[in-house]
Amino acid sequence: MSKSKEAAASSIILKYLNDQNRPYSTQDVFSNLQRDHGLGKTAVVKTMELLAQKGKIKEKVYGKQKIYFADQEQFPSVSDSELKDLDAQVTELSSKLQSSQQSCRQLESELKDLTSSLTTEEMLKEVSCLKEECDRHEHKLTNIKSATNHVTPAEKEKVYGERKHFCKEWKKRKRMATDIFDAILEGYPKSKKQFFEEVGVETDEDCNVTVPDV
């Protein structure tokens, strides 16, 4: 490693250890800095050993493991009251973290329910079948309404009940489809219109149909 690269690596690692102010192994530092700074494992090990030899960082040996950390003498002393304030901040942040993790798990569970209920292909097939069934019942209902004495009150009530049931199913499936699409579109790089065109989705609006009022 050239002098310039060695100096750059020393500066990067020293700043990182001082900023983080916590113990690290050479593997930890390599993993955390390699992506952003392109430091090799050998260079990291050598640089940290040199920094420790020069007294710029501290080194502790635990069996075969070496741990490095910032020289604490460079930092100002902290009073008891400041330590209590820091402890309070840690407690508050830990509580917020737990709350955020709980919310995240809940959202992941909701997303899993949405994505596992029906696949896009199954949903589209189901919507198509329901539309066809609704059309048949609408046609049947129209004929019944136009008739005079050909339908008994019981038959008429049955048809109205079926119409109400299938209209509710239509609304329910439409909400389910909307929820699934919204979940998919959160990670989809294009617009909703482009997604619908790519998978061949036709909405009620595309077909100029609306859910009847019941």
Curated annotation (Swiss-Prot):
GO cellular component: condensed nuclear chromosome; DNA recombinase auxiliary factor complex
SS bonds (residue pairs): none
Coiled-coil zones: 79-147
Nucleus found in the keyword field: yes
Positions of region (DNA-binding): 115-179
Keyword vocabulary terms for this entry: Coiled coil, DNA recombination, Meiosis, Nucleus
GO-annotated molecular function: double-stranded DNA binding; recombinase activator activity
Any one biological process term the GO annotation gives: meiotic joint molecule formation
Compartment list: Nucleus
Signal peptide span: none
One Pfam family recorded for the sequence: TBPIP
Keyword Nucleus: yes
Main function: Plays an important role in meiotic recombination. Stimulates DMC1-mediated strand exchange required for pairing of homologous chromosomes during meiosis.
Family classification: Belongs to the HOP2 family.
Protein name: Homologous-pairing protein 2 homolog
Organism: Xenopus laevis
Lineage: Eukaryota, Metazoa, Chordata, Craniata, Vertebrata
